[in-house]
């Protein structure tokens, strides 16, 4: 599933090119996770004012309303003036005078939803309840630590839930906890101020590095210009079960938490 770094990389790869574009048409294929929420003709003539990100959602601001885009489990966006003919898994196109934005989504768990604004119930249903933006200025340590202290959930699962900090997916949660030296099964409320500060810094560091490396391409992720990500090539623990820890040589272990694979070093992450 594309996580925060992949969504941010996608945003950066087409935001400048589509800004100021006028919508000329909409193509809707097979149904996605949620309906568009308006007739496609309503969007024709609208101007694209910018592209933002909130967690794993892209917000395409129009001069009237906005489009919320989620890539689902296997989705990716492409933006270009001359895209090849639509394929069987291309389910949405925003055709503009500056190029076409196309959603490719084989499993159809993604979505494109129109809302009149961020206060629209359709937008609030998708955006409300998420935690702090880890790459934003409001990612304050005090607020983050207070969120940890209030939860008895194992820290790995709390990171994935997105209610304290948003967008830390499975790969990045494993890498963040390794960098912070915290075992994934440790209860969030048991993490004291010193370790919480290390965790806070590790979240910023890992996600920023992942964006810099173009995200992670495990199966089919690519950005809107077709580029693959490379962060997975330098992972310390993710996908390395049984291999020696890059830091101490102890074999990396694998366990299951909430139906997700968790990788950690039992020596470097003792508690």
Curated annotation (Swiss-Prot):
Q: Where are the zinc fingers (FPG-type)?
A: 236-270
Cofactor: binding comment: Binds 1 zinc ion per subunit.
Needed cofactors, names only, are: Zn(2+)
Which InterPro entries does this entry report, sorted A to Z?
A: DNA_glyclase/AP_lyase_DNA-bd, DNA_glyclase_Znf_dom_DNA_BS, Formamido-pyr_DNA_Glyclase, FPG_cat, MutM-like_N-ter, Ribosomal_uS13-like_H2TH, Znf_DNA_glyclase/AP_lyase, Znf_FPG/IleRS
Quote the record's binding site residues for DNA.
89, 107, 151
Reactions this protein catalyses: Hydrolysis of DNA containing ring-opened 7-methylguanine residues, releasing 2,6-diamino-4-hydroxy-5-(N-methyl)formamidopyrimidine; 2'-deoxyribonucleotide-(2'-deoxyribose 5'-phosphate)-2'-deoxyribonucleotide-DNA = a 3'-end 2'-deoxyribonucleotide-(2,3-dehydro-2,3-deoxyribose 5'-phosphate)-DNA + a 5'-end 5'-phospho-2'-deoxyribonucleoside-DNA + H(+)
Q: What is its EC number?
A: 3.2.2.23, 4.2.99.18
Q: Which NCBIfam families match?
A: fpg (TIGR00577), PRK01103.1 (NF002211)
| Family to which the UniProt record says this protein belongs | Belongs to the FPG family.
Record protein name field = Formamidopyrimidine-DNA glycosylase
